């Protein structure tokens, strides 16, 4: 395993981290409980020390499973979680629709205490605002509350996790430029590079580390869909999207197959190397759903890095819409 330091902190994160949503929700398909535990345990054995979860994943289960499976190694690991969604509202959630958000000081303090309890720990390494809109980010009292939690030793550092659906440019720029955050979590992959690409210079200038999730673009870059599209489980988020988005993604994937090096670097490994070529990205969070994912994705760190020539070709493809008839990228991650 390779490690990268989160700027202005003492945290050394594994270059490949573990996004706990795959074992805390069914958004990426169902996994047996025994397999969930095995994935987490084997991730640590393979060198992963960074685990990213959220209170909303499985209504707290994404934190509880870390305590249950990895609690005995707590001091060796970096636990990041997120807050901002009111998971305590008894109103049933409507499918995958976004919950109501709350960022007032009292709620933030309450949410932090509940996360500490579920994680079975007295401190959180990285506490992230979960998909905050600009109206939350401009509230000084929110960040004063986070600083107080930091002073009390309940959280070590705080950051933002920027979400899907809206452009997020304003939120990203404001967070990186005007708030003393340690990290910003973004979506960044071969198929979806903006607005993360736009944030990289700002992140470098302000010494903020970027964390990149879904580098495989809903598994279109893993080979899973090379021979057709499956019928997704109803709980899988991909079941609620039209096939057109997958079809478009696979047309783009066909343009970047030159990255594959037979017996040396798979497409999935190339996708991880593509993300980690950016020095501002401290850790990449692929979706681990089976044991072979651990071997392949962590193994990406031992494969040839993306060359400058390959990067230049990738940049040109991105700028020209992957040479498709429709030059505007339509693929969007969650």
Task: Please place each PLM-identified region on the residue numbering.
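N-terminal binding-site loop/beta-alpha segment at the start of enzyme catalytic domains
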Residues: 1-78
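Conserved, mostly hydrophobic/aromatic
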Residues: 6, 18, 36, 51, ...
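Active-site groove signature of glycoside hydrolases
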Residues: 116-135
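Short, well-ordered coil/turn segments that N-cap beta-strands
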Residues: 11-16, 47-49, 73-77, 121-125, ...
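A short, structured active-site edge motif that brings together acidic residues
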Residues: 76-88
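Short, acidic/polar
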Residues: 30-43, 104-118, 166-174
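Active-site mouth loops of central-metabolism enzymes
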Residues: 22-34, 94-106, 135
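Beta/alpha (TIM)-barrel catalytic core signal, keyed to glycine-rich beta->alpha loops juxtaposed to Asp/Glu
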Residues: 132-317, 321, 331-334
């Amino acid at each position: 395993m390779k490690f990268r330091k989160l700027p202005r902190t003492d945290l050394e994160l594994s270059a490949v981290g573990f996004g706990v949503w795959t074992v805390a929700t069914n958004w990426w398909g169902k996994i047996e409980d025994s397999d969930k535990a095995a994935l987490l345990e084997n991730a640590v054995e393979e060198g992963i020390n960074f685990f990213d979860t959220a209170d909303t994943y499985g209504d707290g289960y994404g934190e509880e499973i870390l305590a249950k499976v990895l609690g005995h190694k707590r001091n060796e690991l970096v636990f990041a979680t997120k807050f901002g969604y009111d998971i305590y509202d008894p109103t049933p959630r409507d499918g995958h629709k976004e919950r109501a958000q709350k960022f007032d000081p009292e709620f933030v303090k309450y949410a932090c205490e509940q996360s500490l309890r579920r994680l079975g720990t007295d401190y959180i390494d990285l506490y992230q605002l979960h998909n905050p809109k600009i109206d939350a980010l401009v509230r000084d009292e929110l960040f004063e509350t986070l600083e107080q939690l930091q002073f009390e030793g309940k959280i070590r550092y705080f950051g933002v996790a920027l979400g899907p659906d809206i452009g997020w440019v304003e939120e990203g720029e404001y967070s990186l430029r005007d708030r003393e955050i340690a990290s910003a979590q973004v979506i960044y992959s071969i198929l979806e590079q903006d607005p993360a690409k736009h944030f990289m210079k700002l992140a470098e200038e302000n010494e903020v580390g970027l964390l990149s999730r879904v580098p495989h673009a809903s598994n279109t870059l893993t080979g899973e869909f090379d021979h057709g599209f499956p019928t997704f489980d109803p709980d899988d988020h991909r079941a609620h999207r039209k096939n057109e988005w997958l079809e478009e993604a696979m047309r783009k994937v066909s343009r970047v197959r030159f990255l594959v090096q037979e017996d040396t670097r798979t497409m999935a490994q190339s996708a991880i190397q593509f993300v980690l070529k950016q020095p501002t990205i401290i850790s990449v969070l692929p979706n681990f759903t089976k044991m072979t994912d651990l071997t392949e994705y962590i193994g990406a760190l031992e494969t040839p890095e993306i060359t400058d020539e390959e990067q230049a070709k990738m940049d040109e493809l991105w700028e020209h819409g992957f040479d498709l008839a429709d030059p505007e990228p339509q693929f969007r991650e969650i």
